[in-house]
Regions:
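Short, Lys/Arg-enriched N-terminal segments with co-localized hydrophobic residues
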Residues: 1-3, 17, 21
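Conserved catalytic-core motifs of GNAT/GCN5-like acyltransferases
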Residues: 13, 88-91, 151, 161, ...
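A short beta-loop-alpha structural element at the N-terminal edge
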Residues: 27-41
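Conserved glycine-rich acetyl-CoA-binding loop
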Residues: 106-108, 120-134, 143, 157-158, ...
Length: 187
């Protein structure tokens, strides 16, 4: 009978673990964006980037209209705590005009661009942005893209390399008057 008890205990442990992991996922739901998320998205962006670099509410309205399905939003309860967004294109390099021109999105494009990776300050250093980046990578892979492209500042090159992005050199982008590095993940 001892053997059976052990098995039952194990089953109970698994059940408990399942419930805990479900709660965790429920606690931090990840989903795509609709226009109802506009206020929250713009507020998180404003909290994460200086004005010269932050996308405006009007720009996000356009982005959500054209590629809301290429936003990955993470919530803590009802609160938006982090998001990643970017459109899809056949262009191989990320250019400044892409940020402002959401209509350049091409749903059947080869490359998933990443325009923004934002986590509000109080929720940083928990790996939430990383989870969203992994979601974006996973979705791009499922959708048959060639890969993903992003630009980042010097101190983040190493961070994105951990996800499989390779450094391609200094980007032509002068977004916000800052130097950006282009990184690419190829499938």
């Amino acid at each position: 009978g001892v053997h059976m008890d052990n098995e039952k205990n194990l089953k109970d442990e698994f059940k408990k673990a399942d419930i805990e992991s479900i709660n965790l996922c429920h606690h931090r739901e990840i989903r795509t964006a609709t226009i109802n998320d506009l206020e929250a998205v713009a507020a998180v962006e404003a909290e994460c980037f200086p004005a010269a670099e932050a996308a405006t509410k009007e720009e996000f309205a356009e982005r959500i209209k054209f590629y809301g399905d290429h936003f990955w939003l993470m919530f803590d309860g009802d609160k938006l705590i982090a998001f990643v967004d970017g459109f899809v294109t056949d262009e191989e390099n990320l250019t400044d005009e892409m940020y402002a021109k959401a209509q350049l999105h091409n749903e059947s494009g080869a490359w998933q661009m990443i325009f923004g990776v934002n986590t509000i300050p109080a929720y940083r250093k928990h790996g939430y942005a990383g989870e969203l980046i992994k979601c974006a990578i996973e979705d791009a892979r499922k959708q048959g893209r060639k890969g993903l492209v992003l630009t980042c500042k010097d101190h983040l090159v190493h961070y994105y390399a951990k996800f499989g992005f390779e450094y391609e050199g200094v980007s032509e982008s002068e977004h916000g008057g800052v130097k950006w590095n282009q990184m690419r993940l190829k499938f």
